[in-house]
Amino acid sequence: MQRIASIHRQTAETDVHIHLNLDGHGQYNVKTGIGFFDHMLDQLFRHSLIDCDVTVKGDLHIDPHHTIEDCALALGQAVQQALGDKAGITRFSHAYAPMDEALSRVAIDISGRPYLVWHSAFTQPRLGDLDTEMLEHWFLSFAQGAGLTLHVETLYGRNNHHIAESLFKALALALRQAVAIDAGKQGRIPSTKGSL
């Protein structure tokens, strides 16, 4: 079974195209018009081994908010679509990712219940052309689009770039494990209620 999805999300604010393969090799092509954001998505795809093409044309003349939010929603929807009925997936996972002095942890449940618990903070308002407050919003929007419960925490760190990168790498590693097929589940949906 191929776990591939394509999403096209178009509004008056953005035009988002996503094509992904959950069972890829970490190949990606990301073009959002926001350099630092592209760098974070590069980390996500490389370390999750998800193949993904992302193209976003957004109203950057206003600010990056809509571009980041709509990209996260569409990417989440693509993950959810590619997972199908979620039969046989591992479902739960967590991962730590260090980036020099920064260490972050992400725990994930592919539950169908979108929720974000966020414990990370930044000491500067921008990283390149990205408002740091948008990082929490990206994780929330991604969780909503994908139907994930995410617990995201930076345990420590000083450099804001390193903190952000450790967050996306931790998500990548946790997502890679959670979407993996567990042969021991013999194709069953990993829930006592029979659906996710």
From Swiss-Prot:
Flavoprotein in keyword set: no
All disulfide bonds of the chain are: none
- What InterPro entries does the database record attribute to this sequence? IGPD_sf, ImidazoleglycerolP_deHydtase, ImidazoleglycerP_deHydtase_CS, Ribosomal_Su5_D2-typ_SF
This entry's Enzyme Commission designation comes to 4.2.1.19
Q: Its GO CC terms? A: cytoplasm
Which pathway does the database say it acts in? Amino-acid biosynthesis; L-histidine biosynthesis; L-histidine from 5-phospho-alpha-D-ribose 1-diphosphate: step 6/9
Q: Which GO terms describe its molecular function?
A: imidazoleglycerol-phosphate dehydratase activity
Residue spans making up a coiled coil are none
HAMAP family per the record?
Answer: HisB
What family is this?
A: Belongs to the imidazoleglycerol-phosphate dehydratase family.
NCBIfam families xref list:
PRK00951.1-5 (NF002109), PRK00951.2-1 (NF002111), PRK00951.2-4 (NF002114)
Q: What is this protein called?
A: Imidazoleglycerol-phosphate dehydratase
Q: Which organism is it from?
A: Zymomonas mobilis subsp. mobilis (strain ATCC 31821 / ZM4 / CP4)
Q: What is the lineage of its organism?
A: Bacteria, Pseudomonadati, Pseudomonadota, Alphaproteobacteria, Sphingomonadales
